[in-house]
């Protein structure tokens, strides 16, 4: 199996990606397991931040790297929280604090104006100086609920209602979520690119 460093310390992302990538013959190791600290996310887009993270992990480990930068974009908020999704309530905010802040911010927004979209950008670098990274983007439309429902997933999943499924992302099984989510879409594109590239 090809060893690849996953440029994240987010346990939810590690679980989700490692199981899917192992089926493809990739032995995924989280950067934290290799003693690599997080890259500074100075980009203004999901793509910029994913490339920064992948390049940092590849440079520090000498391994190929995969990085994920993802977040929630709420239409009525002009795309916020966007790249700041993980720290919407502050630098060391918990998922629950971020979720509560978003619900509070949207408290007066009518139900028909609560559309949102999860975005995920996955970047694969063969090495730290790779001039042609593979960049894949997936997006997943939904609606922000007024209260949390479900115990699965992580982040904003309990308040992200998926109309096609009739439930929140946190109420979906891992398999259901992987088949339709932003991360599942981006990963499928990445695996296709790796197969063909």
Curated annotation (Swiss-Prot):
EC number: 3.6.1.66
Reactions listed under catalytic activity: XTP + H2O = XMP + diphosphate + H(+); dITP + H2O = dIMP + diphosphate + H(+); ITP + H2O = IMP + diphosphate + H(+)
Obligatory cofactor(s): Mg(2+)
UniProtKB keywords: Hydrolase, Magnesium, Metal-binding, Nucleotide metabolism, Nucleotide-binding
Gene Ontology molecular function: dITP diphosphatase activity; ITP diphosphatase activity; metal ion binding; nucleoside triphosphate diphosphatase activity; nucleotide binding; ribonucleoside triphosphate phosphatase activity; XTP diphosphatase activity
Active-site residues, as the UniProt record annotates them: 69
Xref: InterPro entries: dITP/XTP_pyrophosphatase, ITPase-like_fam, RdgB/HAM1
CDD domains on file: HAM1 (cd00515)
Positions annotated to bind substrate: 8-13, 70, 154-157, 177, 182-183
GO biological process: nucleoside triphosphate catabolic process; nucleotide metabolic process; purine nucleoside triphosphate catabolic process
GO cellular component: cytoplasm; cytosol
Amino-acid positions noted as binding Mg(2+) in the UniProt annotation, renumbered to this chain: 40, 69
Main EC class the enzyme belongs to: hydrolase
Function per UniProt: Pyrophosphatase that catalyzes the hydrolysis of nucleoside triphosphates to their monophosphate derivatives, with a high preference for the non-canonical purine nucleotides XTP (xanthosine triphosphate), dITP (deoxyinosine triphosphate) and ITP. Seems to function as a house-cleaning enzyme that removes non-canonical purine nucleotides from the nucleotide pool, thus preventing their incorporation into DNA/RNA and avoiding chromosomal lesions.
Family, similarity comment: Belongs to the HAM1 NTPase family.
Complexes and interactors: Homodimer.
NCBIfam families: PRK14822.1, RdgB/HAM1 family non-canonical purine NTP pyrophosphatase
Protein name listed in UniProt: dITP/XTP pyrophosphatase
Record organism: Salmonella typhimurium (strain LT2 / SGSC1412 / ATCC 700720)
Gene that this sequence comes from: rdgB
């Amino acid at each position: 199996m090809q060893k690849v460093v996953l440029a994240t310390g987010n346990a939810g992302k590690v679980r989700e990606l490692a199981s899917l990538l192992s089926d493809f013959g990739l032995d995924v190791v989280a950067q934290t397991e290799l003693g690599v600290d997080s890259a500074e996310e100075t980009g203004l887009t999901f793509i910029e931040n994913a490339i920064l993270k992948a390049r940092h992990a590849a440079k520090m480990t000498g391994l190929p790297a995969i990085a994920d930068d993802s977040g929630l974009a709420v239409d009525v908020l002009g795309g916020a929280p966007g790249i700041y999704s993980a720290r919407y309530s502050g630098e060391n905010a918990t998922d629950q604090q971020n979720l509560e802040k978003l619900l509070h911010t949207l408290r007066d927004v009518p139900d028909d104006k609560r559309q949102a979209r999860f975005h995920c950008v996955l970047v694969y670098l063969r090495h730290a100086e790779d001039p042609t990274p593979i960049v894949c983007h997936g997006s997943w439309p939904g609606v922000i609920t007024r209260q949390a429902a479900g115990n699965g997933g992580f982040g904003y999943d309990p308040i992200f209602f998926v109309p096609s499924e009739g439930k929140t992302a946190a109420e979906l099984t891992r398999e259901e979520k992987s088949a339709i989510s932003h991360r599942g879409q981006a990963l499928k594109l990445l695996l296709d690119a790796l197969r063909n590239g």
